[in-house]
Amino acid sequence: MATAAGMGIGAACLVAPQVRPGRRLRLQRVRRRCVAELSRDGGSAQRPLAPAPLVKQPVLPTFLVPTSTPPAPTQSPAPAPTPPPLPDSGVGEIEPDLEGLTEDSIDKTIFVASEQESEIMDVKEQAQAKVTRSVVFVTGEASPYAKSGGLGDVCGSLPIALALRGHRVMVVMPRYMNGALNKNFANAFYTEKHIKIPCFGGEHEVTFFHEYRDSVDWVFVDHPSYHRPGNLYGDNFGAFGDNQFRYTLLCYAACEAPLILELGGYIYGQKCMFVVNDWHASLVPVLLAAKYRPYGVYRDARSVLVIHNLAHQGVEPASTYPDLGLPPEWYGALEWVFPEWARRHALDKGEAVNFLKGAVVTADRIVTVSQGYSWEVTTAEGGQGLNELLSSRKSVLNGIVNGIDINDWNPSTDKFLPYHYSVDDLSGKAKCKAELQEELGLPIRPDVPLIGFIGRLDYQKGIDLIKLAIPDLMRDNIQFVMLGSGDPGFEGWMRSTESGYRDKFRGWVGFSVPVSHRITAGCDILLMPSRFEPCGLNQLYAMQYGTVPVVHGTGGLRDTVENFNPFAEKGEQGTGWAFSPLTIEKMLWALRMAISTYREHKSSWEGLMKRGMSSDFTWDHAASQYEQIFEWAFMDQPYVM
């Protein structure tokens, strides 16, 4: 049967399906017997039979139906001719006696025959067309080119997942050189395209570099402000003073890239879906509405703001607004007033411009990196001053949990593990635990639960609670290992605690990717007492590796970790423990529940491990949810003032 892919949906629906010869003969016999019976009763004159139609006749709209009825015939219509006999099937058969059949029974026979014919023809087959889009990600970082946190992981993986689902995807980010040629950008070539951006009192030229990798167009905006020592956003003295200028250039360049860059021989054009990430890219929806749509450009484009961390909003003094190159009447979209307690002195009016607020106002849809976080940002506690504005846009606010890269985080293939294992064979995990204990200088004890922590050593991650709980935990028969850096005070505490509990505690100051993989695989329990966590990745890695998470029930942690329920049927419910509120008592209670289950209920513990390992946190799953957001965005009209 011809399909919609080759003929178009309408044409495909009008093609008669082919019937196999054997079944056609059986249908012909049934039809021949029915015709013979009706001819005997004289029914053919009133209702001639014909084969059941293969396709329903279309119903005309009411305005196409004739309003006048045709005149009645003056003479009786001539009797309908007797249908010619159908050709014999060539197969011998005994004709049944049809004397006792009524017309109603004949009708039923015809209905059954028609129903069989419909089944044979497979009329249920329908043409399905998937909408593919031109998607433009705008971000301050993307792995493996430049990364400082979870934002880089998302923007390095989600575009690839969308490209694998058939979309044309571009990622626009700065070309960070750190004062010298960065090997991460070695495969990007100069496109010979450059533009001059009118902002900050002049015209600033930027150029474009391009690399095609993993079915994605990676576009790098080049400017001298991206060529300096330090990290992406600052150095040892703090954030760079010209970050507003640096990311204004990025946003302007991202708006121009789909119009001027012929990637693969074709530009992306105007019907794009812009996915802007955090404050660094938040000027893009404002530019689309203020500087492009009024002139007929990007009227068919839409934008989605993805909030990874609401704490960073790109706030600068109000006096910088004219530098952005926006019309004066658009000041209100970015206007921000600090509360009195946050002002520097009594004469400070607290007036500022807020990049992220501009995107919250003008973006067509808003996404947070978990469902729980989408609710938290509308509360006074979690909204960082934008809670009322975000609450007013609840109708376009959704949460989607980030995915993980199962090519990098897979216990059956992980290059950093001494032994591999899977949900069907967990024996390698016990060996990884023993190797980790030996590597860290801890006694090799398979019966002792090994608890781990991986993350920044700061207040947001709940390190202060861990510090308070360690003396109590060390009285129990457990081992505890921590990996991270941050607050110098917490770093010093880790070193001193290791000296006090040589056989039970290890603290690794700093960060090492191989060690983080081995801790994730070797530990039995992962502790995450974060005060807030928009999504969180470590709990996803832990479940992928059969390590049971104990987390504070906030943001993405609450969304992804299902509480263990020992009273469910066969105890088969839950992937960990999520405690709330965030107190030392609640945290210790959850940890002791996990420790008790590990020691005394081995089958329940194995179920926890396997359910976590079977959870679907792939980027493909997240990408399918983003596709739905794109559909919703294109259903509505774009933002205009």
UniProtKB/Swiss-Prot annotation:
Source organism superkingdom: Eukaryota
Signal peptide residues on this chain, from the entry's feature table: none
Coiled coil (residue ranges): none
One MF annotation (Gene Ontology) recorded for this entry: alpha-1,4-glucan glucosyltransferase (UDP-glucose donor) activity
GO BP annotations listed: starch biosynthetic process
Record bears the keyword Glycosyltransferase: yes
Enzyme Commission (EC) number: 2.4.1.21
GO annotations of cellular component type: amyloplast; chloroplast
Binding site for ADP-alpha-D-glucose: 147
A Pfam family hit: Glyco_transf_5
Compartments in which it is found: Plastid, Chloroplast; Plastid, Amyloplast
Region (Disordered): 62-96
Pathway(s) this gene product operates in, as recorded in its UniProt entry: Glycan biosynthesis; starch biosynthesis
Catalytic activity reported: [(1->4)-alpha-D-glucosyl](n) + ADP-alpha-D-glucose = [(1->4)-alpha-D-glucosyl](n+1) + ADP + H(+)
Chief location: plastid
Key word Glycosyltransferase present: yes
InterPro entries given in the database record: Glyco_trans_1, GS/SS, Starch_synth_cat_dom
Keywords recorded for this protein, A-Z: Amyloplast, Chloroplast, Glycosyltransferase, Plastid, Starch biosynthesis, Transferase, Transit peptide
Enzymatic class: transferase
HAMAP family named among the record's database cross-references: Glycogen_synth
Family: Belongs to the glycosyltransferase 1 family. Bacterial/plant glycogen synthase subfamily.
Further remarks about this protein from its record: Three forms of soluble starch synthase were purified: RSS1, RSS2 and RSS3.
The protein, known as: Soluble starch synthase 1, chloroplastic/amyloplastic
